[in-house]
Amino acid sequence: MTDVSRVLKEARDQGRLTTLDYANLIFDDFMELHGDRHFSDDGAIVGGLAYLAGQPVTVIGIQKGKNLQDNLARNFGQPNPEGYRKALRLMKQAEKFGRPVVTFINTAGAYPGVGAEERGQGEAIAKNLMEMSDLKVPIIAIIIGEGGSGGALALAVADQVWMLENTMYAVLSPEGFASILWKDGSRATEAAELMKITAGELYKMGIVDRIIPEHGYFSSEIVDIIKANLIEQITSLQAKPLDQLLDERYQRFRKY
């Protein structure tokens, strides 16, 4: 098994910690909030309020299930527009009260169903990209599994983007890439090699800012590393003048 095929397999493993796991292990007193105030509540995106080392923060992330029943309830981690609108509602609330935002990302992509398109999937993702680029509080995004397409990017316009060691981040799935390029989805591993989807490759290109080492899908060490780094980096980002924070975020994405 090549390194990229191993990463692809491990990034999608159902045994990975989820957003709700991290929300309860890293933060204190996490309280989930629901609904987009327009249509409904989307179980594929979760979010709420918590404390990090005594500081209020907003935590948002894409939630996959750990079994079939849970995955059905979470739509296999593929958000509908109401999920992205819920996330944006919580981010604007965080901006109003001066709370830093931490997002966790694990999705193959936004849900491509007819209903999602009818309710404005593209608009919801685009609105998040626009609003996050100018959100007046620090944002840190962490890839904890799959980071697929615009569905992932809609929570990743951040001051810093981190990846766990054995996760992936790409414009689309390797299967989709292979199907478009060669009309053969079975060449996914070959496509993944060309796409440069691994944390190490993306770090070298400056697309991600930090790689969190993994020692199995769950270890207290991973949680401790993420928590310590979040405390350090949020403190550093909060110390910057607002104009500098926003300009550096803008320049971060302009360089691509």
From Swiss-Prot:
EC number: 2.1.3.15
Catalytic reaction equation(s): N(6)-carboxybiotinyl-L-lysyl-[protein] + acetyl-CoA = N(6)-biotinyl-L-lysyl-[protein] + malonyl-CoA
UniProt subcellular location: Cytoplasm
Pathway this chain belongs to: Lipid metabolism; malonyl-CoA biosynthesis; malonyl-CoA from acetyl-CoA: step 1/1
Enzyme category, top tier: transferase
GO molecular function: acetyl-CoA carboxylase activity; ATP binding; carboxyl- or carbamoyltransferase activity
One GO process term, biological-process aspect: fatty acid biosynthetic process
Family: Belongs to the AccA family.
Function: Component of the acetyl coenzyme A carboxylase (ACC) complex. First, biotin carboxylase catalyzes the carboxylation of biotin on its carrier protein (BCCP) and then the CO(2) group is transferred by the carboxyltransferase to acetyl-CoA to form malonyl-CoA.
Protein name per Swiss-Prot or TrEMBL: Acetyl-coenzyme A carboxylase carboxyl transferase subunit alpha
Source organism: Streptococcus pyogenes serotype M12 (strain MGAS2096)
